[in-house]
Amino acid sequence: MSRISAEAEKVRHALIEKGIETPMIALTKSKNERRIGIENRMREVMQLIGLDLTDDSLEETPVRLAKMFIDEIFSGLDYTNFPKITNIENRMKVSEMVLVNDVTLTSTCEHHFVTIDGLVSVAYYPKKWVIGLSKINRVVQFFAQRPQVQERLTEQILLAFQTILETEDVAVYMKATHFCVKCRGIKDTNSYTVTSAFGGVFLEDRETRKEFLSLINK
């Protein structure tokens, strides 16, 4: 098993301490062992719903699903996949808001294992550190690649950046469509869900929060 980076461990510990870590157990098997286990069980599931796995269109589906679960859509359950973050000292004394708007987010509803599709905006006021802008996208993607509920995902992203940047002054805004609502149950194709999380000056100062919300809605 690969080792978890110090940055990833700090973030994981912060989430556990606050009680907002995704419910999960320790990974004791290798990726290949987990892929094989999922493949075998997905084969059973597909047969139980009546699919013919001798058909050439379906016979490799259990293999594809196992790879997708481990290497792609649920890769954020494994902290060895946490993005490498290099904190850059804020020598330029940047003091204005840094905002990355409309980060594409694709996650999976943990209740029905169908898609959550949306956009995320992340802002912070630098203190000691800044980070590369693409790292914001990568951290968002890491936490999205898990079975999720949107409210917890929003809080996880907030706390992750507060931990990495060593500042409370972070804001997160998320707008997403839930396919568990769109393609099953009520089958509402029009609604979306908005969540937000604020820390530091974004929480305490109404004008700062207002500025953030006006910028992301331009």
Curated annotation (Swiss-Prot):
InterPro entries assigned: GTP-CH-I_C/QueF, GTP-CH-I_N, GTP_CycHdrlase_I, GTP_CycHdrlase_I_CS, GTP_CycHdrlase_I_dom
MF terms per GO, please? GTP binding; GTP cyclohydrolase I activity; zinc ion binding
What do we know about how this protein assembles, alone or with others?
A: Toroid-shaped homodecamer, composed of two pentamers of five dimers.
Question: One Pfam annotation, family name?
Answer: GTP_cyclohydroI
Please name the SUPFAM superfamilies in this protein's record.
Tetrahydrobiopterin biosynthesis enzymes-like
Show the NCBIfam families listed in the entry. folE, PRK09347.1-1, PRK09347.1-3
Q: Where does Zn(2+) bind?
A: 109, 112, 180
The text of the family note is:
Belongs to the GTP cyclohydrolase I family.
User: What does the record give as the reaction this protein catalyses?
Assistant: GTP + H2O = 7,8-dihydroneopterin 3'-triphosphate + formate + H(+)
Give a GO biological-process term: tetrahydrofolate biosynthetic process
| Protein EC | 3.5.4.16
Could you tell me what this protein is called? GTP cyclohydrolase 1
This protein's GO CC annotations: cytoplasm
Q: Give yes or no: UniProt keyword Zinc-finger.
A: no
Q: In which pathway does it act?
A: Cofactor biosynthesis; 7,8-dihydroneopterin triphosphate biosynthesis; 7,8-dihydroneopterin triphosphate from GTP: step 1/1
Query: Which keywords annotate this record?
Result: GTP-binding, Hydrolase, Metal-binding, Nucleotide-binding, One-carbon metabolism, Zinc
- PANTHER family associated with the record: GTP CYCLOHYDROLASE 1, GTP CYCLOHYDROLASE I
Broadest EC class?
hydrolase
Q: Which organism is it from?
A: Mannheimia succiniciproducens (strain KCTC 0769BP / MBEL55E)
